[in-house]
Amino acid sequence: MKITVIGAGSWGTALALHFSQHGNRVSLWTRNADQVRQMQEARENKRGLPGFSFPETLEVCADLAEALKDSGLVLIVTSVAGLRSSAELLKQYGAGHLPVLAACKGFEQDTGLLTFQVLKEVLPDNKKIGVLSGPSFAQELAKQLPCAVVLASENQEWIEELVPQLNTTVMRLYGSTDVIGVAVGGSVKNVMAIATGLSDGLEYGLNARAALVTRGLAEITRLASAMGAQPKTMMGLAGIGDLILTCTGALSRNRRVGLGLAEGKELHQVLVEIGHVSEGVSTIEEVFNTACKYQIDMPITQTLLQLIRKEMTPQQVVERLMERSARFE
């Protein structure tokens, strides 16, 4: 199958590498013309994922029309902020009918829409829209280390066809029709990872980390259920699986945000040092707004938002959470 990957960050590049190494032709496209030239010349993404050479089956395209030609699937792997404009480009290039998966995680700012909802709004006639989510770091996938992720869509028949087509010995795919649950789990875990990094950076220990991960899962489950998801989805790869990896993994950008804030650094400085998008930061406010809309209590999210707004110190965030009134779990 010909697969088009839009977005050449670390995750987009890792997916392009993976699928091109497992029987697919892949076209990788990004808006950044300088980055396209660099990748074409070096046959490597030295900016987004250095150290991994591109196989012959991976084509880097400067022309989106060429990248979309004969494609059977489009993966949009931009930041969430770039998702809508990428979907608009599909329409503009006459490719709005192609099957499309959002492989980014978060809520769209201002609208509060999940990624698949953005795609449905831009491409209302497309019946093959879904998300790819689950516990997976780009570096490990590029090294061909095993992982398991979820493909979710409201279109069950399509997912049943797509999963065996994309399944490999390195990336085990599971299908789901609970696209809300999969999308919410992948989005809100980024917020919880910042909180866990904050606690670890303050050296509050493993007990505190376990408490944050567990209560974070409770917050995610409450919100997802209120939005129409199946609670059991939060017990799977897109829920607790992604949460554990992002909260504890050394490669987690969102965890690194929390660690940086615990050192007393300004948020801007932390993000510059990381050098990549941290969706958790841009997601916090939309998650909190959505929780308010559904009247869901999300104390970890709320206190983190106050930290980002400089209304609290890192120490006060943890103190506030521990001072909450006693209750049954």
From Swiss-Prot:
<dbReference type="GO" id="GO:0046168">
    <property type="term" value="P:glycerol-3-phosphate catabolic process"/>
</dbReference>
<dbReference type="GO" id="GO:0006650">
    <property type="term" value="P:glycerophospholipid metabolic process"/>
</dbReference>
<feature type="binding site">
    <location>
        <position position="31"/>
    </location>
    <ligand>
        <name>NADPH</name>
    </ligand>
</feature>
<keyword id="KW-0521">NADP</keyword>
<dbReference type="Pfam" id="PF07479">
    <property type="entry name" value="NAD_Gly3P_dh_C"/>
</dbReference>
<dbReference type="InterPro" id="IPR008927">
    <property type="entry name" value="6-PGluconate_DH-like_C_sf"/>
</dbReference>
<feature type="binding site">
    <location>
        <position position="254"/>
    </location>
    <ligand>
        <name>sn-glycerol 3-phosphate</name>
    </ligand>
</feature>
<keyword id="KW-1208">Phospholipid metabolism</keyword>
<dbReference type="GO" id="GO:0046167">
    <property type="term" value="P:glycerol-3-phosphate biosynthetic process"/>
</dbReference>
<feature type="binding site">
    <location>
        <position position="277"/>
    </location>
    <ligand>
        <name>NADPH</name>
    </ligand>
</feature>
<feature type="binding site">
    <location>
        <position position="136"/>
    </location>
    <ligand>
        <name>sn-glycerol 3-phosphate</name>
    </ligand>
</feature>
<dbReference type="InterPro" id="IPR011128">
    <property type="entry name" value="G3P_DH_NAD-dep_N"/>
</dbReference>
<keyword id="KW-0444">Lipid biosynthesis</keyword>
<dbReference type="InterPro" id="IPR013328">
    <property type="entry name" value="6PGD_dom2"/>
</dbReference>
<keyword id="KW-0520">NAD</keyword>
<keyword id="KW-0443">Lipid metabolism</keyword>
<feature type="binding site">
    <location>
        <position position="242"/>
    </location>
    <ligand>
        <name>sn-glycerol 3-phosphate</name>
    </ligand>
</feature>
<dbReference type="GO" id="GO:0008654">
    <property type="term" value="P:phospholipid biosynthetic process"/>
</dbReference>
<keyword id="KW-0547">Nucleotide-binding</keyword>
<feature type="binding site">
    <location>
        <position position="105"/>
    </location>
    <ligand>
        <name>sn-glycerol 3-phosphate</name>
    </ligand>
</feature>
<feature type="binding site">
    <location>
        <position position="279"/>
    </location>
    <ligand>
        <name>NADPH</name>
    </ligand>
</feature>
<comment type="similarity">
    <text>Belongs to the NAD-dependent glycerol-3-phosphate dehydrogenase family.</text>
</comment>
<dbReference type="InterPro" id="IPR006168">
    <property type="entry name" value="G3P_DH_NAD-dep"/>
</dbReference>
<comment type="function">
    <text>Catalyzes the reduction of the glycolytic intermediate dihydroxyacetone phosphate (DHAP) to sn-glycerol 3-phosphate (G3P), the key precursor for phospholipid synthesis.</text>
</comment>
<feature type="binding site">
    <location>
        <position position="252"/>
    </location>
    <ligand>
        <name>sn-glycerol 3-phosphate</name>
    </ligand>
</feature>
<dbReference type="GO" id="GO:0005975">
    <property type="term" value="P:carbohydrate metabolic process"/>
</dbReference>
<feature type="binding site">
    <location>
        <position position="105"/>
    </location>
    <ligand>
        <name>NADPH</name>
    </ligand>
</feature>
<dbReference type="GO" id="GO:0005829">
    <property type="term" value="C:cytosol"/>
</dbReference>
<feature type="active site" description="Proton acceptor">
    <location>
        <position position="189"/>
    </location>
</feature>
<feature type="binding site">
    <location>
        <position position="253"/>
    </location>
    <ligand>
        <name>sn-glycerol 3-phosphate</name>
    </ligand>
</feature>
<dbReference type="Pfam" id="PF01210">
    <property type="entry name" value="NAD_Gly3P_dh_N"/>
</dbReference>
<keyword id="KW-0594">Phospholipid biosynthesis</keyword>
<dbReference type="InterPro" id="IPR036291">
    <property type="entry name" value="NAD(P)-bd_dom_sf"/>
</dbReference>
<feature type="binding site">
    <location>
        <position position="253"/>
    </location>
    <ligand>
        <name>NADPH</name>
    </ligand>
</feature>
<keyword id="KW-0963">Cytoplasm</keyword>
<feature type="binding site">
    <location>
        <position position="11"/>
    </location>
    <ligand>
        <name>NADPH</name>
    </ligand>
</feature>
<dbReference type="InterPro" id="IPR006109">
    <property type="entry name" value="G3P_DH_NAD-dep_C"/>
</dbReference>
<feature type="binding site">
    <location>
        <position position="189"/>
    </location>
    <ligand>
        <name>sn-glycerol 3-phosphate</name>
    </ligand>
</feature>
<dbReference type="GO" id="GO:0047952">
    <property type="term" value="F:glycerol-3-phosphate dehydrogenase [NAD(P)+] activity"/>
</dbReference>
<keyword id="KW-0560">Oxidoreductase</keyword>
<feature type="binding site">
    <location>
        <position position="134"/>
    </location>
    <ligand>
        <name>sn-glycerol 3-phosphate</name>
    </ligand>
</feature>
<feature type="binding site">
    <location>
        <position position="138"/>
    </location>
    <ligand>
        <name>NADPH</name>
    </ligand>
</feature>
